[in-house]
Amino acid sequence: MKFFALFIYRPVATILLSVAITLCGILGFRMLPVAPLPQVDFPVIMVSASLPGASPETMASSVATPLERSLGRIAGVSEMTSSSSLGSTRIILQFDFDRDINGAARDVQAAINAAQSLLPSGMPSRPTYRKANPSDAPIMILTLTSDTYSQGELYDFASTQLAPTISQIDGVGDVDVGGSSLPAVRVGLNPQALFNQGVSLDDVRTAISNANVRKPQGALEDGTHRWQIQTNDELKTAAEYQPLIIHYNNGGAVRLGDVATVTDSVQDVRNAGMTNAKPAILLMIRKLPEANIIQTVDSIRAKLPELQETIPAAIDLQIAQDRSPTIRASLEEVEQTLIISVALVILVVFLFLRSGRATIIPAVVVPVSLIGTFAAMYLCGFSLNNLSLMALTIATGFVVDDAIVVLENIARHLEAGMKPLQAALQGTREVGFTVLSMSLSLVAVFLPLLLMGGLPGRLLREFAVTLSVAIGISLLVSLTLTPMMCGWMLKASKPREQKRLRGFGRMLVALQQGYGKSLKWVLNHTRLVGVVLLGTIALNIWLYISIPKTFFPEQDTGVLMGGIQADQSISFQAMRGKLQDFMKIIRDDPAVDNVTGFTGGSRVNSGMMFITLKPRDERSETAQQIIDRLRVKLAKEPGANLFLMAVQDIRVGGRQSNASYQYTLLSDDLAALREWEPKIRKKLATLPELADVNSDQQDNGAEMNLVYDRDTMARLGIDVQAANSLLNNAFGQRQISTIYQPMNQYKVVMEVDPRYTQDISALEKMFVINNEGKAIPLSYFAKWQPANAPLSVNHQGLSAASTISFNLPTGKSLSDASAAIDRAMTQLGVPSTVRGSFAGTAQVFQETMNSQVILIIAAIATVYIVLGILYESYVHPLTILSTLPSAGVGALLALELFNAPFSLIALIGIMLLIGIVKKNAIMMVDFALEAQRHGNLTPQEAIFQACLLRFRPIMMTTLAALFGALPLVLSGGDGSELRQPLGITIVGGLVMSQLLTLYTTPVVYLFFDRLRLRFSRKPKQTVTE
């Protein structure tokens, strides 16, 4: 009593306390960062190594394996995958959430150093690492185009000046430059001319290397002067290499230009990038795992004007893709939804209380509670994101509930003629414990979420804490500011005021009278209600088992990614044509705004595309509908497949794949894996629950297998080293020398001119100089035949791995797909030597599925414990919790009705319902217990009176929660696919719960009261206290 009186009779102090809460919240709001979702990125580090010309199997055994053994010893590595292709190896290390990325990077560098002695000596550089996940979609893509500059010059400018500058911006983890390669002097050899002159490829390589050196020459000095010695020991352009003497034949000089075509070109000609049908260099910018995407993008945009000034006028720098506009639009939609929810909740209060003065009170209390929450969010290091703003939207209904319970009870005393200050004090005292019980039991629902580990726990923690803080502030404000405002603002009702909104008032009275009559009938037929309650419990179980499930709702971020996979023997020229064809098909779609893509590098038969869709208000289809439409058109393109997927804000794992979900096959027996992977992939491709099934195992690449006759080689004076060097010199784009320039270093690349390698007969023109100086054709000591070879070799841990990727067809859920895959694996009878498991997001889904039921049970148990402590009873918490089955049925039926799968967002809705629907029972039970203690009523009379007296606040709180969630259901625009499942779950649960719990709660109350009396040692005792 004294606590409430302290605030009621000191209005200035109470107002200033509320102002302080509001001011702190405003300051916190201004400093909160903006993000699509809470920070849930795993720390990921990518290690890269190269050995030009080495086969995928050579890279895997000689480069990947030594590095994996060393990197695998690092603490906190949750997953290690590697992919080795022609001349390159990439190892992805994913760490535990709590692992510091900088500390992990130091450990990675130490592991690389430890493995250095085990790596091949011919590697052009040491392995490097980057603190970025290559499988993440870029947060921004910049393109460079020009009508005058070559692709090599554009690439040089991008990699030398733009990429380093952008990499220094806070939050940027990696800037990947694609579409070409650095400038280089290319030496294209003529095998026949070399043979005629008696010059070997090694002779050419040695001559070029010796002619271009960069060594210190020292200095000269006398008594007064000092001269630095400088020589013309470097050759920098193709024109300078052309006249280089590489050999003497019969006294005549053989110059490089006599046996080769020397051009200023690029290091790797098998690279191509495009933007909207125009050749382009792409700068794909990815953020650090812990960075905020909006802040990083804003920093890059702020830097762009400065970068524009350094660019020649003939180079056009454009933003081809930016993730931030859809994120901002999504957050604006949530903010609008929040405002609408507040307005609707206040409207509910006005309709029920029929007083403008009374309505002002929640109109003040709700903003104070919500705004004050921003301060706590800032102190906790949270951000303004879809989940935290949705938590505040839902909190609108919760925070007004506390105010409604206090306000309605005070209003009831005022209507009975009590003076305002006395009514405020008496009304608050009566419901203070009720409000405390409602708030504490609601916060208790989220305690299991705070203890939940892994990605789901990290994702839900921000939601739970934000909502809990809002409820805590609401509890404080409702017991301080609300009674003070009631005492000083409200007046005793007058007859003319009671006539306002007569229609709604009469309707409410009629509803209450009808409810009273129906409740009397129900209390006389309790067994029937018991059967209904048991039926809802059984229906809950059946609906949960049968409803489709997924991890997270499919988002429409306005960005698509596409992976091209062509025939494994395709040439680069043909692959570039496929890229152009696919880009034209997509560019012609009316919903597409921009298309960029690239192909080439170590995997000639693959490519990537990044597609920006038009804003949601300029297109009628969702991203998935656009993908479905494009899939039909793209399927008509022969010789290649383009797999499209919508970019999501949550992506788990470091595997780069052509689809959203992965299923990984592991084996220590590589032969068994290669045997069973095609069988499994073909089987999965027939399943209607899966779409776009593809694999990263490609074993049918064209290979030319050379078999040396070692006896013949020994007789001819040729060793294997010389023969292998010949092949590397001829076909490996071998980097044989370095050209040093002020801004960068460039390479001299030697190979047989592509004009002479158009078919297999090119091998017949190759020759080796033996130890006697004679030219011996390769065909003298080697035979060759075409064969199949892998284009890549993949590992997970230290086991051979193959990952099958898939998307979900429209109308199918991840639970449907995972169940279908499990059935297919069983039907195929896959041997135990080949192990299959879900990876990435699909793996997290499996883990979440296993913990969902435990989480719900833990939440219910926590609420039971809190209620038991508050009521000092084992029984009354069960009465209150009996409201939950009907809410679960309503939520699951609503999801089924809207064809929405049960996702992590729907799970949040279920957890919220546990907290919401029990409020009705708390109000009933509190007043029934009070009536039994002080009114000398029987249990049946007490619960009946409690139901009627609390009918109005029950309706008010339920409608407030319902109207607070309704905008989530009806919202459209960006991010609606996240908001709608939450709103659907809450609205469906509230409607069903309201229909049933008004009858089931009093029946359960009476049932447990009879049970208590039956087992009580003191039968005459009426109430358990």
Curated annotation (Swiss-Prot):
GO MF annotation, one: xenobiotic transmembrane transporter activity
Keywords: Cell inner membrane, Cell membrane, Membrane, Transmembrane, Transmembrane helix, Transport
Keyword Cell inner membrane belongs to the record: yes
Membrane topology term: Multi-pass membrane protein
InterPro entries xref list: AcrB_DN_DC_subdom (IPR027463), Acrflvin-R (IPR001036), Multidrug-R_MdtC (IPR023931)
GO cellular component: plasma membrane
Membrane-spanning intervals of the chain: 3-23, 333-353, 360-380, 387-407, 431-451, 463-483, 528-548, 853-873, 875-895, 897-917, 953-973, 984-1004
The keyword Magnesium belongs to this UniProt entry's keyword annotation: no
Subunit composition and interactions: Part of a tripartite efflux system composed of MdtA, MdtB and MdtC. MdtC forms a heteromultimer with MdtB.
The name this protein goes by in its record: Multidrug resistance protein MdtC
